[in-house]
């Protein structure tokens, strides 16, 4: 299995208590090599203000969000391994984990898995796409040793 090259950038006011780089690497490696040989992904961990600004600029949503995915579009005729960027908001991930009663580490893992699938072209706009994407997320999360992230919705 090929390994994903990770460029981890921490842009939070306080970076203490964040997952280790090795954890981010493990989570990426559980997803991307199944679909693509050589890949490079940037993960940028930000605070609420940056997430809010990016979400408003790129999605027209006036609030912070847990994860944004920015796939890299390779120009025709060029071969590059850059898959794209994930921007994850620390405070939103922490708040969601608490509200949903999920272990924080598991929710971080889920955000990386979810965002990575977006980089690979998966989406959840249509119901059938959402079902396919959620099934993949669940399969990957279980393989990583975490619970089904959608278990509460299925009960």
Curated annotation (Swiss-Prot):
The protein's matches in InterPro entries, at most eight in alphabetical order, are given as:
MetalPrtase_cat_dom_sf_prd, YbeY, YbeY_CS
Q: Which cofactor does it need?
A: Zn(2+)
Q: Which protein, by its recorded name, is this?
A: Endoribonuclease YbeY
Q: Which GO terms describe its biological process?
A: rRNA processing
Q: What is its EC number?
A: 3.1.-.-
Q: Which domain of life is it from?
A: Bacteria
Q: Which NCBIfam families match?
A: rRNA maturation RNase YbeY
Binding-site positions, Zn(2+)? 114, 118, 124
Report the sequence similarity comment from the record: Belongs to the endoribonuclease YbeY family.
Q: Which GO terms describe its cellular component?
A: cytoplasm
The function of this protein is: Single strand-specific metallo-endoribonuclease involved in late-stage 70S ribosome quality control and in maturation of the 3' terminus of the 16S rRNA.
Task: Report the cofactor remark.
Answer: Binds 1 zinc ion.
Any single GO molecular-function term of the entry would be: metalloendopeptidase activity
List locations, semicolon-separated: Cytoplasm
For whether the record's keyword set contains Nuclease, the answer is yes
Could you confirm whether the keyword Nuclease appears in this record?
yes
Q: Where this protein primarily resides, as one coarse class?
A: cytoplasm
Q: Pfam families under this entry?
A: YbeY (PF02130)
State the UniProt keywords alphabetically: Cytoplasm, Endonuclease, Hydrolase, Metal-binding, Nuclease, Ribosome biogenesis, rRNA processing, Zinc
Q: What class of enzyme is it?
A: hydrolase
């Amino acid at each position: 299995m090929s390994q994903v090259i990770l460029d981890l950038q921490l842009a939070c006011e306080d970076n203490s208590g964040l997952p280790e780089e090795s954890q981010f690497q493990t989570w990426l490696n559980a997803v991307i090599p199944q679909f693509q040989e050589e890949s490079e992904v940037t993960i940028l961990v930000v605070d609420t203000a940056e997430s809010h600004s990016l979400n408003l600029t790129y999605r027209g949503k006036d609030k912070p969000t847990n994860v944004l995915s920015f796939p890299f579009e390779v120009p025709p005729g060029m071969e590059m391994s850059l898959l794209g960027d994930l921007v994850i908001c620390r405070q939103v991930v922490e708040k969601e984990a608490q509200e949903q009663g999920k272990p924080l580490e598991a929710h971080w893992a889920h955000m990386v898995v979810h965002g990575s699938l977006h980089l690979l072209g998966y989406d959840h706009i249509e119901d059938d796409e959402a079902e396919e994407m959620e099934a993949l997320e669940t399969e990957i999360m279980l393989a990583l040793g975490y619970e089904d992230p959608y278990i509460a919705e299925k009960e």
